[in-house]
Curated annotation (Swiss-Prot):
The protein's name in its UniProt record: AP-1 complex subunit beta-1
GO biological process: Golgi to vacuole transport; intracellular protein transport; vesicle targeting, trans-Golgi to endosome
UniProt source species: Saccharomyces cerevisiae (strain ATCC 204508 / S288c)
Membrane topology according to the record: Peripheral membrane protein
Family stated for the protein in its record: Belongs to the adaptor complexes large subunit family.
Gene behind the chain: APL2
Misc note: Present with 2690 molecules/cell in log phase SD medium.
UniProt function note: Adaptins are components of the adaptor complexes which link clathrin to receptors in coated vesicles. Clathrin-associated protein complexes are believed to interact with the cytoplasmic tails of membrane proteins, leading to their selection and concentration. The AP-1 complex interacts directly with clathrin.
Any one Gene Ontology molecular-function term assigned to this protein's record: clathrin binding
Cellular localisation: Cell membrane; Membrane, Coated pit
Entry GO CC: AP-1 adaptor complex; clathrin-coated pit; cytosol; plasma membrane
Length: 726
């Protein structure tokens, strides 16, 4: 609820109000009437309602000339509303906005810096290549403006205009002005200039030598880092991460200067700082690493107290960094324990981090994690339980001692008998443990004893990889299974319906055991694999086995092929290749770090989807604008059935009975400009056009009713308060 004094002011203001109010329906006819009202407050209310309808997705572009008439005011709030309307249609309806370019040029010379800023920003958003002929002089003036707020906006406009016509931007020299802005005294200007140069470099790598610019301005970036806003810091830190230090002293200096930002409240700033530190960490001495690692560890711990979405991004980046520095967070294992209110995507990432963090030489830590994972495996979310079971086997394989592996095996066997829905995951994990300890017959007998009790394994096991592991176990330990042939026959009968991994495993198992099985089983599976399957790998493997069995020394040859044991599993955790890891470390905090897919060509062929009108003369653009407004003037007829009567009554009471297209001709005294030297002439026309506006005010374009508006007098004070920040 607003304060009492504001409510009293609003009550008094509404009590003595003479100007008619705008209803909440938002009909175009009523808005059009309000926009040309003789009362300033009514016009302002109509603009607000128009903006409201625009934000709701309604097309109010037919009100463009009526809205733009109200730009001639000293009320900063009203002018900002008009500019907000114009900017909304600048990209989608550029042919409309180009007609008001003279008004923007006039505002670009306004004494108020906020208005100058809005004018140059709006002009740069008009997606028409002809705008460059009119924006050159205002842009150069604002690039060297005395006010930093205007300069920081102007440097962004250069990148937008470069997208329209890069050749002309280079010819005009505004790119050079943008490079000179890197030496500006204001840190926000430096940050925006850097962002604009990066965008230009992405559009055309030959336009600017970004690497040399970064190298020559590292000191400026480091000085500006502590004085700019958080989003400007992200830009500067991202730029510093692209720089390779010359020696260990410079790398140490960069790390020391950015380390303070590890404690920033914005997680994006923290990740950008970590990226800079990781980039320079290999170049500094090993003795300094321990202190930096502690600070990095504290930063990651703080990220675990952020909202779940930010935690997810942080966990993905931690996963990359742990591969390079596995000892980074070994003492912070408990921070990554799953909480009851964590969303599923965070839970899955935390389990992966836990298994990677645990120290295999620390039995106590491994035992605590084993107990924690056992609890996770008894939860109700299928994906979470599946990942916890997989983590149990990964933990047993990572610790490597058979006594600890036996504990993991007992937990998995207990889970296997408890619930049918997790049999697939338990089967896969148990087979991984047996491959990790191939010589442990006791463990093999334990596992086979449980599987031996299954009467219909093809029904209990659902996934292809689980069936593949089960059939592999039949071939590896045939003596531990009773009625082996019937168990294999079940899979032969469903051979065609099985997937590729199960078919391949069944083929290899039968060939391996063909001496102890009946001959018809081998014949059947070879025929099925060569004639019935659509998997090329299975068919080729079956053809190879068939030819080997047809050779004179087939037994010894088949034994050589099948009796070799699979290598022992030493680690089931996925790892990046060295090349991919180095690329991902360079892209921390980006979308590449989330998908683990480095975007090596992100600076090559970056495409920009844009709505740019090119090759049109001013006369053509004016005709396009008139046709568009004319076609949309009565778009709401189908919904507002009484609109014709309302419009008739309204027009009878209006002082000016100009039509919509006539308003366009009177409002925009806009002649074609073929050269940038005619801009001063156009400025004069624009000022004269504004003076001739009939808005119920004096010849200066300021309504006489503005004196009754309490907000008008305070507009400049508010804008000055904002500008004092710069």
């Amino acid at each position: 609820m607003p304060p009492l004094d504001k409510r009293i002011k609003k009550f008094l203001k509404d009590s003595i109000r003479i100007a008619p109010k705008i209803s909440g329906k938002g009909e175009l006819s009523e808005l059009r009437t309000g926009l040309v009202s003789q009362y300033p407050q009514t016009r302002k209310d109509a603009i607000k309602k128009t903006i409201q309808q625009m934000t709701l997705g309604k097309d109010v572009s037919s009100l463009f000339p009526d809205v733009l008439k109200n730009i001639a005011t000293i009320d900063v709030e009203q002018k900002k509303l008009v500019y907000l309307y114009v900017m909304n249609y600048a990209e989608t309806h550029p042919e409309l906005c180009i007609l008001a370019v003279n008004t923007f040029i006039t505002d670009a010379q306004d004494p108020n810096p906020l208005i100058r800023c809005m004018a140059i920003r709006t002009m740069s958003m008009i997606r028409v290549d002809k705008i460059l002929e009119y924006i050159e002089t205002p842009l150069r003036r604002t690039l060297h403006d005395d006010n930093a707020y205007v300069r920081k906006t102007a440097v962004i406009c250069v990148a937008k205009l470069f997208q329209l016509n890069k050749d002309l931007c280079v010819e005009l020299g505004v790119v050079e002005d943008l490079v000179n802005a890197l030496d500006d005294s204001n840190p926000l200007v430096i940050a925006n200039a850097t962002a604009a140069l990066i965008e230009i470099h992405n559009m055309d790598m030959d336009a600017v030598d970004l690497s040399s610019l970064i190298q020559s301005h590292v000191s400026q970036f480091l000085l500006a880092l502590n004085e700019c806003t958080e989003w400007a810091r992200i830009i500067i830190l991202g730029t510093l991460s692209e720089y390779s230090a010359k020696d260990s002293l410079e790398a140490q200096d960069i790390i020391d200067r950015v380390t303070a930002h590890l404690q920033h409240v914005n997680p994006a700033v923290v990740l950008a700082t970590i990226k800079v530190i990781v980039r320079n960490l290999p170049q500094i001495e090993y003795s300094s690493n321990s202190l930096i690692m502690k600070r990095l560890s504290s930063a990651f711990v703080s990220l675990m107290s952020t909202p779940p979405e930010m935690q997810y991004v942080a966990l993905k980046n931690i996963r990359i960094i742990l591969e390079k520095y596995p000892e980074l967070l070994t003492k912070e294992l408990r921070i990554f324990y799953v909480k009851f209110n964590d969303p599923l995507y965070v839970k899955l990432e935390k389990i992966d981090i836990l298994v990677r963090l645990v120290d295999p030489s620390n039995l106590k830590q491994c035992t605590l994690l084993l107990t924690e994972l056992k609890e996770y495996a008894m939860e109700y979310e299928p994906e979470f339980v599946s990942r916890a079971i997989q983590a149990l086997s990964q933990l047993g394989i990572k610790y490597a001692q058979e006594s600890f592996v036996s504990k993991v095996l007992d937990i998995l066997l207990e889970l296997l008998e408890r619930q049918d829905t997790i049999k697939d995951d338990c089967c896969i994990s148990l087979c991984d443990l047996l491959r990790h300890c191939p010589g442990n017959d006791k463990m093999a007998k334990q596992v086979c004893a449980v599987f031996n009790t299954w009467s219909n394994p093809e029904v209990l096991l659902q996934s292809d990889i689980a069936k593949c592991n089960y059939v592999w176990l039949l071939g590896q330990h045939p003596n531990n299974f009773s009625d082996l042939e019937s168990k294999i026959n079940i899979f032969i009968e469903n051979f065609v319906q099985e997937e590729a991994l199960t078919q391949m495993s069944l083929l290899m198992t039968i060939v391996r055991l063909h001496a102890t099985l009946t001959g018809s089983m081998l014949q059947s599976v070879l025929e099925l694999a060569t004639q019935q399957t659509h998997e090329l790998d299975v068919r080729d493997m079956a053809m190879m086995y068939w030819r080997c069995l047809s050779m004179p020394n087939n037994e010894s040859l088949v034994n050589d092929l099948c009796q070799n044991k699979l290598p022992m599993i030493s680690n089931t955790l996925e790892k990046f290749s060295p090349e991919v890891l180095e690329k991902l470390l360079m892209e921390l905090g980006t979308i590449s770090s989330i998908y683990f897919k480095p975007d090596s060509n992100r600076r090559k062929g970056k495409k920009y989807v844009q709505n740019i009108v090119k090759g049109k003369h001013i006369e053509e653009l004016e005709s396009m604008a008139k046709n568009e407004i004319s076609s949309k003037a009565n778009d709401d007829v189908l919904l507002d059935f009484d609109e014709r009567d309302d419009v008739t009554n309204t027009n009878a009471g209006m002082l000016n009975t100009l039509t919509t297209l006539g308003d366009l001709d009177d409002l925009f005294d806009f002649g074609p400009s073929e050269d940038a030297t005619q801009i001063n002439t156009n400025d004069t026309k624009a000022v004269q056009g504004l003076k001739e506006l009939k808005l119920g005010g004096d010849s200066n374009g300021i309504s006489s009713g503005g004196k009754n508006n309490p907000d008008v007098s305070g507009g400049n004070i508010v804008s000055q308060d904002l500008l004092d920040l710069f």
